[in-house]
Amino acid sequence: MLGLGTLFLLLAACPASRADPVPALPDIQVQENFNESRIYGKWFNLAVGSTCPWLSRIKNKMSMSTLVLREGATGAEISTTSTRWRRGVCEEVSGTYEKTDMDGKFLYHKSKWNVTLESYVVHTNYDEYAIFLTKKFSRHHGPTITAKLYGREPQLRDSLLQEFREVALSVGIPENSIVFMEDRGECVPGDLEQKSTSLLRARRAVLPQENEGSGTGPLVTDVLKKEDSCQLSYSEGPCLGMIEKYYYNGASMACETFHYGGCLGNGNNFNSEKECLQTCRTVAACSLPIVQGPCRAYVELWAFDAAQGKCVQFSYGGCKGNGNKFYSEKECKEYCGVPGDGYEELTRS
């Protein structure tokens, strides 16, 4: 889907056209008797439309993705996790919506870019579909409005697709700016699309789960090894995009997010936390504490427990962890020097 990261890129980069000015944004009515708890759970993003002319430049690259909504860290927030294919790599982006005094209306504000998004749930039956409208206000770019269609399943009946089209048209979105997403299937963060072999250049391959280890296999280089960039500070670059990427923070020994402008920058720039960790993490990560993090994605991963001297499974919340986080037991053992599976049997008293 267009999750927070991609939606932010779309809206922040969208200028108001002088030749065809965007009209004042309409008042939006939310779903009557909106029930917040019923909107939680997993959704598939099936369609998008926008008054932003920039959409036409990327619509052929967009594909169906997923969004998971959960209770936030506080009662005033909703936690969002979107998973999508981007440039041949599956990436996961977490974010937070702020609740307002209007049920069904949420805010996302980025002070650095002086941009506020207002999202409204305008139509939903909770068990089948939901239509969101999002307003963007910027003193630099003017107002835009974006419509998104979600389904509990990857397919919806035709009448709901038509309802979405009518909603989008009713708020001024042009017919040629309504896009129904290609279904490329769900993805696991860090995985590569089969056809994206060109992405293997100048980066360490993210190995399949069954063969996953420390990533110490051959690295294809193209002027500069990715590892050589791990100690650099992140660089947003001079362009004005809002692409959420990961960089390795040597001080915290963790991969953290930053917004990449879309051009130049440096090699400490990764599409996923998994790719970042497998390229930059060192054995020093094995001495770090096991950190679940404040988010609530609850992904089952592996970490090295120094007190027990072995790799253990734990539930990772999805954000603000550290480098002591591995995507398979084998990878953990290879990094942290744990003996093979037969070791305990041989040494047991």
Curated annotation (Swiss-Prot):
- For the site Inhibitory (P1) (chymotrypsin, elastase), which positions are given? L240, G241
Q: Which InterPro entries match?
A: A1-microglobln, AMBP, Calycin, Kunitz_BPTI, Kunitz_BPTI_sf, Lipocalin_CS, Lipocln_cytosolic_FA-bd_dom, Prtase_inh_Kunz-CS
Q: Which residues of the sequence carry a binding annotation for 3-hydroxy-L-kynurenine?
A: C52, K110, K136, K148
Which species expresses this protein natively? Mesocricetus auratus (Golden hamster)
GO MF, any single term:
heme binding
* Site (Inhibitory (P1) (trypsin)) location in chain: R296, A297
Q: What are the glycosylated positions? A: N35, N114, S214
Name-wise, this protein is Protein AMBP
Pfam families, sorted: Kunitz_BPTI, Lipocalin
Q: By its UniProt entry, which PANTHER family does this protein fall under? A: PROTEIN AMBP
Q: What is its EC number?
A: 1.6.2.-
Family classification: In the N-terminal section; belongs to the calycin superfamily. Lipocalin family.
Signal sequence coordinates: 1-19
* Domain BPTI/Kunitz inhibitor positions: 230-280, 286-336
What's any one GO cellular component for it? endoplasmic reticulum
Q: In which tissues is it expressed?
A: Expressed by the liver and secreted in plasma.
Keyword vocabulary terms for this entry: Cell membrane, Chromophore, Cleavage on pair of basic residues, Cytoplasm, Disulfide bond, Endoplasmic reticulum, Extracellular matrix, Glycoprotein, Membrane, Mitochondrion, Mitochondrion inner membrane, Nucleus, Oxidoreductase, Protease inhibitor, Proteoglycan, Repeat, Secreted, Serine protease inhibitor, Signal
Q: Which cysteines are joined by disulfide bonds?
A: C90-C187, C230-C280, C239-C263, C255-C276, C286-C336, C295-C319, C311-C332
- SMART domains in the cross-refs: KU
Share the record's PTM remark: The precursor is proteolytically processed into separately functioning proteins.
